[in-house]
Regions:
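Short coil/turn segments at secondary-structure boundaries
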Residues: 12-14, 47-50, 106-110, 147-151
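His/acidic metal-ligating clusters that form di-metal
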Residues: 79-82, 91-95, 109-137
Length: 333
């Protein structure tokens, strides 16, 4: 779960239902990420907190250049490893996150998502659990046609995706305090996008220079090429379903080439007055010798049930819908 607050209300409910939990939040934030697990089956083996603002993505330059960030966001990734009581020596690694929300900061979300995968793989290796599957799920704040999604699942970048990355290679005043606030960024089309709305345009930022350390397009592609490709549980699972009446997917409303991944994600995972899109995913990284099988999925909400917006009584208590999957892994001999 992401954007979790009111722990004094939530934790007793989880405990009554037989769940233990691990909670983590960014510095100074009043909400965070929570992973709950059944106490009868799992116990906490190890944890790791990933602070995206502090993570380095290159080895050259000063500390800011090595981090290569465009915005100090205070977002985190929370990694935990769980021992399975029912299978001796087995377990699962779970990573959850809430990436930076601003729709124009495509580069920063790509940076954060790449760091999350890198650190999840590193964490699994550091605790000698390479044979355990890794589930990476959360609110990624990007749609299936976003550059970050394509980079994660191994699709080549399209020209418009490269353009969104290039125009978001900026440095915000939160990283460089010498930048005056409310200075417009280098996105040429901002004049046509209601520039008075800071939630839809880049402000208080300047174009990145080479000394800022932001990855160039070839460097970003190379960064992701060194990472394992993620598999989306819903994209694969819904792609195998054809007998659910009224089921529509992201590809039903957004044209994607047949070869592109993401077309079978739910049509929406968030449906509010301001945002109607897909933001949430369940990804998996399988161990080398243990392929996964999708046994069942929680059916997405029908769009007709979302048109009045969420949260909505009887539909969803959150402005995001729930995603759930039952998975199995079989170890090859």
């Amino acid at each position: 779960m992401q954007e979790v607050d009111r722990l004094e209300k939530l934790i007793p409910v989880l405990e009554k239902a037989g769940y233990a939990h691990h909670y983590a939040s960014g510095p100074g934030k009043k909400h965070g990420c929570l992973v709950a697990f059944r106490k009868t089956q799992y116990s906490l083996h190890a944890t790791k907190l990933v602070r995206y603002d502090d993570e380095e993505i290159r080895t050259d330059g000063d500390i800011n250049a090595r981090r290569g960030r465009s915005f100090q966001t205070r977002n985190i990734g929370s990694l935990i490893a769980l021992n399975d009581h029912l299978l001796e020596g087995r377990g699962v690694v779970v990573a959850t996150t809430h990436l930076f929300w601003h729709p124009k900061y495509t580069y920063e979300r790509a940076r954060q998502s790449g760091i999350l995968v890198r650190e999840a793989v590193r964490f699994r290796s550091e605790i000698n659990c390479d044979s355990w599957p890794c589930i990476i799920a959360g609110d990624f704040n990007f749609a299936p046609d976003d550059a970050a999604y394509s980079l994660l699942v191994g699709d080549p970048l399209l020209p418009d995706q490269e353009e969104s990355l290039l125009t978001s290679r900026v440095v915000h005043t939160s990283v460089d305090p010498t930048i005056p606030r409310s200075a417009a960024g280098p996105v040429e089309e901002q004049a046509d996008e209601a520039a008075v709305d800071p939630d839809k345009v880049i402000t208080s930022a300047r174009p990145a220079t080479s000394t800022d350390g932001l990855l160039t397009m070839p460097e970003l592609i190379a960064f992701f090429s060194r990472l394992p490709r993620l598999r989306s549980v819903y994209d694969e699972g819904l792609g195998m379903v054809s007998d659910v009446e009224g089921l529509t997917t992201f590809g039903s409303r957004v044209k994607l080439l047949a070869a592109r991944k993401g077309r079978n994600e739910p049509e929406y995972t968030s449906y509010t007055h301001y945002w109607k899109t897909v933001l949430d995913y369940i990804f998996v990284l399988n161990p080398f010798n243990s392929p996964s099988k999708i046994k069942s999925l929680l059916a997405p909400h029908l769009t007709t049930n979302l048109i009045n917006g969420i949260p909505q009584k009887g539909v969803s208590s959150s402005d995001h819908v729930s995603l759930a999957a039952e998975m199995s892994w079989v170890q090859d001999l």
